[in-house]
A protein has these predicted regions:
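Catalytic core of membrane glycerolipid acyltransferases/transacylases, capturing the structured
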Residues: 34-97
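Short beta-alpha junction loops
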Residues: 70-74, 125, 157-161
Length: 211
């Protein structure tokens, strides 16, 4: 595990250097360093966006935080598999959905939360190549419903789509910022659509253009 931690720290450093990534905390109490079970949910723009969110967390929190990523991308080669499973300890899910999915994509996420680990999640369910945030899938609601008091922290990733344009394998140097907002919790008897809208609105509010 020591070599994986070293490689993880190295990748975090490289990501910061290439993108100039900086964390901006808009939460009233500043960044959370308690390491309590949390879902960090963000707007997906590239296959490395979870890396920047992960790298922006304090090391003590990062060690207990696992990104959720698509198995269809990260299991396509031995190197990607190693990076995803050994370095990031990613929770890999099938994104085909529907009745054709071999397993419940939420099962592994539930297990991680049950073990006291946090997650990095992208509620849109797919990489969004447009400017507007897509409607959220119900997964984040179901996870919050199954874990009362679970903290959901919105993270708006700015400029990453231009750092890793679609089809690109080499990052384009460009300043990138991660905007962390106040944590949300599912309210008592709060309906699914209400929570999804509230979570989505909280994420959109962090976008610089929304200021």
């Amino acid at each position: 595990m020591k070599i994986e931690r070293l490689l993880g720290a190295t990748l975090c450093g490289l990501a910061r250097i290439i993108t100039g990534a900086r964390a901006i905390h808009h939460a009233a109490n500043g960044p959370d360093t308690t390491g309590g079970t949390t879902i960090y949910y963000a707007n997906p723009r590239s296959h490395i966006d979870f890396l920047l969110v992960w790298a922006a967390l304090p090391p003590s929190v990062r060690r207990r935080t696992r990104p959720v990523a698509g198995a269809d991308y990260w299991l396509t080669s031995p190197l990607r598999r190693y990076v995803a499973l050994r370095i990031f300890r990613a929770v890999l899910v099938e994104r085909s959905g529907g009745a054709q999915a071999a397993t419940d994509p939420l099962a592994a996420m539930q297990a991680a939360l049950d073990a006291g680990e946090s997650l990095i999640l992208f509620p849109e369910g797919t990489r969004n190549v447009g400017d507007d945030l897509l409607p959220f899938k119900s997964g984040i609601f179901r996870l919050a419903q199954a874990h009362p008091g679970l903290r959901c922290v919105p993270v708006w990733v700015e400029n990453l789509g231009r750092v890793m344009p679609k089809g690109s394998f080499i990052p384009v140097p460009l300043l990138c910022a991660l905007h962390f907002g106040d944590a949300l919790c599912l309210g008592d008897d709060e309906a699914r659509d209400s929570f999804l809208k509230r979570s989505r609105d909280a994420l959109i509010a962090l976008a610089p253009t929304a200021a």
